UniProtKB/Swiss-Prot annotation:
Family per similarity comment: Belongs to the YajQ family.
Function: Nucleotide-binding protein.
Domain of life: Bacteria
Matches recorded under NCBIfam families: PRK05412.1
Cited InterPro entries: DUF520, UPF0234-like_C, UPF0234_N, YajQ-like_sf
Keywords attached to this entry: Nucleotide-binding
MF (Gene Ontology): nucleotide binding
Protein name: Nucleotide-binding protein YajQ
């Protein structure tokens, strides 16, 4: 029986490359000359710290970071940015967490979405991924389109497609 897994993963090497590209652009931009502005990736917690001298500049840095990550194949929805910026001394900063795995609430929404579609497939939650099995490849491809089209606030990848 054909099957595949629905996962939500961020390639940390690509994230590091995107952060490095964003740092390079910030260093060369005129509006950031003489300004303390940094973007740092913490591999251990899978967070990105964006720091600058004003909240407006932090927003600009976030826009640059999102654009560079998108060029590296990481969607902006995989960044979980807190709404409030932290003011510490003369700097402002914000922590953005990279979403890894699918939370249980989102998993339940996906399974409900698949079951409500009346396709002849079964969806099983397995840890941080969802295994979908069905008799025909067409049904599985319909499920892929359904999950991509559903507005669930997170990008998904499909792997382990077996025939």
């Amino acid at each position: 029986m054909p099957s595949f897994d629905i996962v939500s993963e961020v390639d940390l090497q690509e994230a590091r490359n995107g952060v490095d590209n964003a740092v390079r652009e910030v260093e060369s931009r005129f509006d950031f000359r003489g300004v303390e502005a940094t973007i740092e990736l913490n591999d251990a917690n899978k967070t990105i710290k964006v720091l600058s001298e004003s909240d407006f500049q932090v927003n600009q840095l976030l826009d640059i970071l999102r654009a560079k990550l998108l060029k590296r194949g990481i969607e902006g929805a995989s960044l979980d940015v807190s709404d409030e910026f932290v003011h510490s001394g003369k700097t402002w900063y914000v922590e953005a967490k990279l979403k890894q795995g699918i939370e249980s609430a989102v998993q339940k929404k996906i399974v409900k979405l698949i079951k409500d579609s009346k396709l002849k497939v079964q969806a099983q939650i397995q840890g941080e991924e969802i295994r979908v099995t069905g008799k025909s490849r067409d049904d599985l491809q319909s499920v892929m389109a359904l999950v991509r089209g559903g507005d669930l606030g997170q990008p998904f990848q499909f792997k382990n497609f077996r025939d």
